[in-house]
Amino acid sequence: MIDGISPMLPAAGGPVAGVPREWIPNASPRPWRCIVIHHSATPSGGAAAFDKMHRAKGWDELGYHFVIGNGTDTRDGQIEVGPRWPKQKWGAHAKTADNRYNDYGIGICLVGNFDVDRPTAAQMRSLSKLVAYLMRTYHIPADRVLGHGDTKPTDCPGHHMSVAAVRRMAAQVLADSGAPVEPGSQAAAIERS
């Protein structure tokens, strides 16, 4: 268990003890290989607001799998599940020439501009629990927990968001649960199937 969250998801749907129902995909899991952390670069917002912004750009829906609130549109630290996650649909959050980070990366966006401010303590706690859960469930090693800027040149997730701190916090959540932390495998080794 990870702080009350079961470490395994079923292949598709169905209740799992201790896991928020919305975290359980309705479709067979994708072969997730990494987690990509973003900031919204806005002082406020939430999944609904970002979905509207993404649709205005011509996208089919919210590009992230999860959004973590900062207390503006949603409760501070609240994890919102985007419509892509239940369907296990590829992301639209980290475009590269070969699209591997969208195809194989779970996109998590924290509300806030972390070039200016720091994420809240509640956001970091929620992020570390979610990342630990996803690492354990999908066998994602710590070095495949990335900032958007690790996938291409961008300031996202901001100068005040430490991805190294997220990795450490998630590793601590796993250690406290008795779950092993998988050794690193070099983020550059994410290959297309």
Question: Where are the regions a protein language model picked out?
Answer:
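Short, solvent-exposed loop/turn and secondary-structure capping segments
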Residues: 47-49, 78, 91, 121
